[in-house]
């Protein structure tokens, strides 16, 4: 029995000196495992005289309970200490500034399209849409663009086959609108267009907004009035000066390029306007009689005007962006400025 007491004393001392749960588990195996010291003591009971076995068995079982209770108590203490140490390492400094909730925002191109459609909507224009994969007739022929026109060249247009292509402008939407209805028309067609071009100011895919107004008695003066009102509202300059330069487009006659006084230097001349004081923003003109003929509208009774502008170009001018490619590179540092 004295040997058993010494065994218990040594076990309790070892348990009390265990510094982590792994060492404690090793002690459990050493004393209470299948081949543990106390387990072997129980197995040796058969060697004792019969009259000594009950008392010895009870003493060994009490020893096992004592060791087991000591193991449980020490395990609880070590677990609490480990948790406290872990919490100390993971503590939160409540004096640090909090992390703001990330807030998204519309892409600058989307914002610009919405601004354009909203302003032209206030002038009575309704949004119309059409397919991005177009046929040759609606993209070219119906718009008075003959087969020999440079715009039909492979290096300017993405073709699927001889008759199918990615639309090079949103003007085909105007043709489809006029095919499906009767005047008067007052529509705008925002959307993606595609051309074989890529540099600082051009992209293979970009966005356009085309406008069309057809009615009786429509003149170039109406066109100028609409565009002046729109541009002044878009750039938020009530005294914004515009000029219309003669130009050529197959689907309008007469045609013009629209310039605005540079919104960056006020017309004094700067790097943005190449020191001319003017910025080109869109093309326009009166709808060509041949276009009316393709859609069955009497050009003797009805007249109309059309205009088209590049959304990215307008966004660059409005937000002071000097590289078109920034709109498509998905750089969060750039896009976050518009959130």
Swiss-Prot record:
InterPro entries: aa-tRNA-synth_II, aa-tRNA-synth_II/BPL/LPL, Phe-tRNA-synth_IIc_asu, Phe-tRNA_ligase_II_N, Phe_tRNA_ligase_alpha1_bac, Phenylalanyl-tRNA_Synthase, tRNA-bd_arm. It is found in: Cytoplasm. GO terms for molecular function: ATP binding; magnesium ion binding; phenylalanine-tRNA ligase activity; tRNA binding. GO terms for cellular component: cytoplasm. Gene3D superfamilies: Bira Bifunctional Protein, Domain 2 (3.30.930.10). Mg(2+) binds at residue 253. Its cofactor is Mg(2+). It is an enzyme of class 6 (ligase). CDD domains: PheRS_alpha_core (cd00496). Coiled coil: none annotated. Keywords: Aminoacyl-tRNA synthetase, ATP-binding, Cytoplasm, Ligase, Magnesium, Metal-binding, Nucleotide-binding, Protein biosynthesis. Binds 2 magnesium ions per tetramer. PROSITE patterns: AA_TRNA_LIGASE_II. Pfam families: Phe_tRNA-synt_N (PF02912), tRNA-synt_2d (PF01409). It catalyses: tRNA(Phe) + L-phenylalanine + ATP = L-phenylalanyl-tRNA(Phe) + AMP + diphosphate + H(+). Belongs to the class-II aminoacyl-tRNA synthetase family. Phe-tRNA synthetase alpha subunit type 1 subfamily. This is Phenylalanine--tRNA ligase alpha subunit. The lineage of its organism: Bacteria, Pseudomonadati, Pseudomonadota, Gammaproteobacteria, Chromatiales. The gene is pheS.
